[in-house]
């Protein structure tokens, strides 16, 4: 019975790990030409939101001031007016092109993420029996571990996710989600989320240890608190 569970659970676990990556890669390649063609031919707006437009205008003004200052300090500024205009035109085109590529990247990744969530949801729904077997197999594996290893694993996972050094990891993860879904980067919101999520998770873990582990395995709780101290 254990061997049968392992034969079913291991391939299913591997498929769960690699399916999102495979779906993302496949749909990125297949959707990219279609989205690029749609954006360049039918989309009238250059910017996805007002924040992007504001950032581009600020960058354009900055470039214009830098080039103007550069021309003013030259010996014969009048002879460089035409060159100045040409250079500003080139930089403007490059700036808009860069933001156009960035918008395509946002739309492509957002579409791929939505499709990936839908496919994963359907996969879990259709493979409900395999999911139950996987859950049973994991519970058996955890049950066979010693209390010391269990306590060490809990301590390691909690330190990685809600420990003192987890802040930078949360910033990278939330920033990555922001980029994938095309949300404008906001340091205040990210800072608030980084300071909130670990606290919520820490509270949930403490409640789980107090409510569940104290009832199931008091010795595990004692070992965990001893290691934590």
Swiss-Prot record:
One of its GO terms (cellular component) is chloroplast inner membrane. Signal peptide: none annotated. Keywords: Antiport, Chloroplast, Hydrogen ion transport, Ion transport, Membrane, Plastid, Plastid inner membrane, Potassium, Potassium transport, Transmembrane, Transmembrane helix, Transport. The chain crosses the membrane at residues 7-27, 106-126, 154-174, 189-209. It is a multi-pass membrane protein. It is found in: Plastid, Chloroplast inner membrane. It catalyses: K(+)(in) + H(+)(out) = K(+)(out) + H(+)(in). It comes from the Eukaryota. GO terms for biological process: potassium ion transport. The keyword Transport applies. Disulfide bonds: none annotated. InterPro entries: CemA. GO terms for molecular function: antiporter activity; proton transmembrane transporter activity. PANTHER family: CHLOROPLAST ENVELOPE MEMBRANE PROTEIN, CHLOROPLAST ENVELOPE MEMBRANE PROTEIN-RELATED. Contributes to K(+)/H(+) antiport activity by supporting proton efflux to control proton extrusion and homeostasis in chloroplasts in a light-dependent manner to modulate photosynthesis. Prevents excessive induction of non-photochemical quenching (NPQ) under continuous-light conditions. Indirectly promotes efficient inorganic carbon uptake into chloroplasts. Belongs to the CemA family. This is Potassium/proton antiporter CemA. It comes from Dioscorea elephantipes (Elephant's foot yam).
């Amino acid at each position: 019975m254990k061997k049968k569970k392992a034969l079913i659970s291991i391939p299913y676990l591997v498929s769960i790990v690699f399916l999102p990556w495979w779906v993302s890669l496949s749909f990125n390649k297949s959707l990219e030409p279609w989205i690029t063609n749609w954006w360049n031919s039918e989309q009238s707006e250059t910017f996805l939101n007002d924040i992007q437009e504001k950032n581009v205008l600020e960058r354009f003004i900055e470039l214009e001031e830098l080039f103007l200052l550069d021309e003013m300090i030259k010996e014969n500024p009048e002879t460089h007016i035409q060159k100045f205009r040409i250079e500003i035109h080139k930089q403007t085109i490059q700036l808009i092109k860069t933001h156009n590529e960035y918008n395509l990247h946002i739309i492509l990744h957002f579409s791929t993420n939505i499709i990936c969530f839908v496919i994963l949801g359907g996969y879990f729904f259709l493979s409900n029996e395999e999911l139950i077997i996987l859950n049973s197999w994991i519970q058996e594996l955890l049950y066979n571990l010693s209390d010391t290893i269990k306590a060490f694993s809990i301590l390691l996972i909690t330190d990685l996710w809600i420990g003192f050094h987890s802040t930078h990891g949360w910033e990278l993860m939330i920033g990555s989600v922001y980029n994938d879904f095309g949300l404008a980067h906001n340091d205040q919101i990210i800072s608030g989320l980084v300071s909130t999520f670990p606290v919520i998770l820490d509270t949930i873990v403490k409640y789980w240890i107090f409510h569940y582990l104290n009832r199931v395995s008091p010795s595990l709780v004692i070992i965990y608190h001893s290691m934590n101290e």
